[in-house]
């Protein structure tokens, strides 16, 4: 018996092709897509304007299956976090962040992450596998209709989720073939209808795929920078050894030729005594001098294996002031959902690690080299 086709895996073109295989005309695909993504239908017999013959075909050949919630936590500040079962011993986390004028969903793209950034708790679990398109868009599908139920909104009311950030577990550009169709559905007016400015992909700097994305589907781009020079970034973001800062900055400039926004957002995790000195801020000014940008400074959320500490608020403000004095728009991210471990860098989920990262002791005993100052010689810093 053939496996059922999960219709959440199909963007508009793929769904049209699938309906063609069933002997149906393209308008049936549009109807079907609307039932799934506008109304949250998971049963074909509820799709009243589809021909009965099509509903019967779909019932035996297809399904609408999003990842199932294992846990569902609501923070005191309204942040809501789901732990979602994606099978094979893996679970990923998805977070909804309410704000006064928008609702943002933070979406995962992989079970675990192979990039292994020094300050991120996702990386400490290693990497299992890429998520499918259905598992990615299924997070938005599940969260939108769960939030509608929570807030008492009907199918004709405005959507709850107005923004999506691909900033959850995983490196999206290392799962390109599943992430792009999922984002096409986010942008599709017959699905979620988000603008390219309201879908943000965050990358640690996979340069070739940044170039590819700029041609295929240029959404808003955020780059996980976190360091002002290669020596430091090699330690904090190991991918930098493959795509150093000069290549990354050049890729950012190329991306802006196609981007829906006229700036790149640089994310910068503030680590006490590591990357938070005024000298680092000054070096950043030189690094991004010809890249229109804004900075999002992120107070570090500690976890035991990191051996790192959060910069104090005064130091973060001093750092931000250097950037702002140079005319760079700079924000300090407000910590949300930390009472349910939903803040930035805290998403961990459950990962059946194929890389055996934890087993091989890749955390806890690391003593990375970090510069004393931006222009100084590296010294050894042992975990706290």
UniProtKB/Swiss-Prot annotation:
S-adenosyl-L-methionine binds at residues 170-171, 202, 224-226, 301. One of its GO terms (cellular component) is cytoplasm. Disulfide bonds join 106-344. The keyword Ribosomal protein does not apply. [4Fe-4S] cluster binds at residues 113, 117, 120. Its cofactor is [4Fe-4S] cluster. Pfam families: Radical_SAM (PF04055), RlmN_N (PF21016). Its EC number is 2.1.1.192. GO terms for molecular function: 4 iron, 4 sulfur cluster binding; metal ion binding; rRNA (adenine(2503)-C2-)-methyltransferase activity; rRNA binding; tRNA (adenine(37)-C2)-methyltransferase activity; tRNA binding. Keywords: 4Fe-4S, Cytoplasm, Disulfide bond, Iron, Iron-sulfur, Metal-binding, Methyltransferase, rRNA processing, S-adenosyl-L-methionine, Transferase, tRNA processing. Coiled coil: none annotated. Binds 1 [4Fe-4S] cluster. The cluster is coordinated with 3 cysteines and an exchangeable S-adenosyl-L-methionine. It is found in: Cytoplasm. Signal peptide: none annotated. It is an enzyme of class 2 (transferase). SUPFAM superfamilies: Radical SAM enzymes (SSF102114). Belongs to the radical SAM superfamily. RlmN family. Reaction proceeds by a ping-pong mechanism involving intermediate methylation of a conserved cysteine residue. NCBIfam families: rRNA_mod_RlmN. This is Dual-specificity RNA methyltransferase RlmN. It comes from Cupriavidus necator (strain ATCC 17699 / DSM 428 / KCTC 22496 / NCIMB 10442 / H16 / Stanier 337) (Ralstonia eutropha). The gene is rlmN.
């Amino acid at each position: 018996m053939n496996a059922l086709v999960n219709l959440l895996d199909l963007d508009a073109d793929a769904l049209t092709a699938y309906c063609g295989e069933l002997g149906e005309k393209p308008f049936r695909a549009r109807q079907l897509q609307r039932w799934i993504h506008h109304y949250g239908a998971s049963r074909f017999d509820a799709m009243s304007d589809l021909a009965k013959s099509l509903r019967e075909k779909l019932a035996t050949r297809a399904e609408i299956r999003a990842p199932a919630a294992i846990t569902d936590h609501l923070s005191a500040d309204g942040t809501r976090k789901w732990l979602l079962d994606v099978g094979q011993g893996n679970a990923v986390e998805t977070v909804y962040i309410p704000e006064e004028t928008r609702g943002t969903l933070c979406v995962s793209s992989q079970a675990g992450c192979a990039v292994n950034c020094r300050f991120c708790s996702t990386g400490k679990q290693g990497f299992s596998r890429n998520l499918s398109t259905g598992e990615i868009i299924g997070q938005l599908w599940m969260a939108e209709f769960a939030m509608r139920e929570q807030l008492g909104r009907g199918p004709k009311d405005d959507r709850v989720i107005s923004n999506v950030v691909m900033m959850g577990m995983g490196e999206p550009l290392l799962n390109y073939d599943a992430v792009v169709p999922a984002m096409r559905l986010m942008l599709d007016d017959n699905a979620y209808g988000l603008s390219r400015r309201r879908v943000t992909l965050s990358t640690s700097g996979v340069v070739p795929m940044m170039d590819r994305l700029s041609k295929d589907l240029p959404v808003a781009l955020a780059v996980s920078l976190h360091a002002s020079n290669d020596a430091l970034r090699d330690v904090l973001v190991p991918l930098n050894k493959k795509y150093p800062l000069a290549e990354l900055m050049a890729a950012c400039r190329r991306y802006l030729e196609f981007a829906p926004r006229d700036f790149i957002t640089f994310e910068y995790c503030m680590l006490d005594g590591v990357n938070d000195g005024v000298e680092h801020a000054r070096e950043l000014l030189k690094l991004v001098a010809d890249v229109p940008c804004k900075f999002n400074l992120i107070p570090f959320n500690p976890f035991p294996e990191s051996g790192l500490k959060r910069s104090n608020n005064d130091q973060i403000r001093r750092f931000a002031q250097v950037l702002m004095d140079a005319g760079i728009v700079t924000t300090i991210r407000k910590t949300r959902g930390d009472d349910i471990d939903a803040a930035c860098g805290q998403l961990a989920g459950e990962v059946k690690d194929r890389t055996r990262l934890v087993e091989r002791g890749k955390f806890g005993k690391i003593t990375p080299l970090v510069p004393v100052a931006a222009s100084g010689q590296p010294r050894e810093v042992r975990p706290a």
